[in-house]
Curated annotation (Swiss-Prot):
Ranges that cross the membrane: 3-23, 46-66, 74-94, 100-120, 145-165, 173-193
HAMAP family found in the cross-reference section: YciB
Any one GO cellular component localisation term in the record: plasma membrane
Protein name: Inner membrane-spanning protein YciB
Organism: Azoarcus sp. (strain BH72)
Amino acid sequence: MKFFLDLLPVILFFVAYKFAGAAPDDSHALVAQFLGAGISPSQAPILIATAVAIAATLAQVLIVWLRHGKVDKMLWVSLAIITLFGGATLVFHNPTFIKWKPTVFYWTFAGALAVSALLFRRNLVQKMLEAQIRLPAPVWQRLNLAWIGFFTLMGFLNLYVAYGYSEEAWVNFKLFGAMGLMLAFFLGQGFYLSRHLEEDAK
């Protein structure tokens, strides 16, 4: 349930983009009604998908708050970023802002991990996971560095796809490419950690 909830905005963004692209006339009319004239039919899918992503993230925050009585800081950050960059895309009718949104989020997360470790001597990855697993301090440090490196690279990769390929290719990458890479990263991390968990058990 949590995994699906985490992916909800990305999934709905993808679905909305595809549905809007399949009905260009209706999509264009809808966007023109709410955002005004001067919008080309080709802009409608990304604008509709952006509005859906903002609404989905708001719903995500509300669901988490109703279920748990609190909301994680990174989810608040995600809501702030999608509202700011998605809102700019809707106001200025420019997809550049929403294309930068994943990169800003990835780099914000990587930056928080790095600053916390360097300035405050706090390992945020350890803080997130230590209730579930026990690891030696050097392993926690390597894990923190791996997360910083991975999310920094993901930020660059998002920009590469956004500016090097078509808008539709970027939308596909957001769901399948980025999520696939994250899954591979966490699976690889699991294999790496399993060795240290076995050693700790011995």
